[in-house]
Amino acid sequence: MANALAGNRIMCITWIAPDEYAATKLRDTVDDSIEFVRNSTPQEGPMRMIHSFFSEGPEYEMSESWIEGKHPPKTGRVILNLYEIYATEEGLDLAWVEAAEWFPTLAEMLEEFKIEMTVANQLSITHNLWD
């Protein structure tokens, strides 16, 4: 059903690691947090997490190659994304509070390995095609 997720809240964290070694360190940190998130996040009710996924791939140079069906050259950096969808704003707020204990470790790792981080938080889903 189209737009079944409309109105739900999403958070997206994008990390850009300068190389594969730094990306591996970030992957290890994410792997360490998965069980914590699984056990601390509501799976039912208005505060529930609807979906979460982690994706990654190489960073590519900006180029028109994509519209020609070709891949442009890779930069050597690695892009990693974490997406979490929650039923409500309050559910996403709770997720941040619950994750606070991980922030010092994450901040230290980002600084040590020179990993860039961008957060888009409390975005409201406006359209989705399929569930």
Kindly label every feature range from the protein language model:
Residues 1-98, 111-131:
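Short S/T/G/P-rich N-terminal loop/turn motif that feeds into the first structured element of a domain
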